[in-house]
C-alpha cells in the first residue's frame, strides 16, 4: 500500500552501550511512551534486519519510524511535552542520532 499525503519522520539511534540490554529496553520503553503523541498517525520501532548487502547500513541500534498528516503535525510533535520528556529521559543512552524526514514527491 502506497503512503500518500504524509510526512515521514524516520530516526536511527546508535546506543552508547550497544550490547547493554537494559539501555536498549529503556530506549524502547521511551519510544513506546513517545508513540502516544496524538499527532502521530503510525509508528514502528525496529532493529536492523538480518540482511547484508553493500548498500545496507545495519550499524544502528534502534529505528523509530513515524508518519504524520503534514509538516505542521510533525512540528507540533517536536515541541510536544511527551517528546521533550523522551529527550530528557533517553538522550543519555545514545551516542548518535540520524533523522530522515520526507514528503511526497
Segments predicted by a language model, with ranges:
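Short S/T/G/P-rich N-terminal loop/turn motif that feeds into the first structured element of a domain
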Residues: 1-61, 65, 69-76, 103-105
Amino acid at each position: 500500500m502506497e503512503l500518500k499525503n504524509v510526512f515521514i519522520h524516520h530516526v536511527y539511534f546508535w546506543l552508547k552501550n550497544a550490547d547493554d540490554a537494559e539501555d536498549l529496553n529503556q530506549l524502547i520503553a521511551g519510544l513506546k511512551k513517545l508513540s502516544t503523541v496524538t499527532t502521530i498517525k503510525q509508528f514502528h520501532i525496529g532493529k536492523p534486519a538480518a540482511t547484508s548487502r553493500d548498500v545496507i547500513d545495519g550499524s544502528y541500534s534502534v529505528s523509530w519510524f513515524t508518519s504524520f498528516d503534514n509538516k505542521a503535525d510533525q512540528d507540533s510533535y517536536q515541541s510536544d511535552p511527551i517528546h521533550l520528556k523522551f529527550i530528557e529521559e533517553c538522550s543519555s543512552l545514545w551516542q548518535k542520532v540520524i533523522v530522515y524526514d520526507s514528503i511526497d514527491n
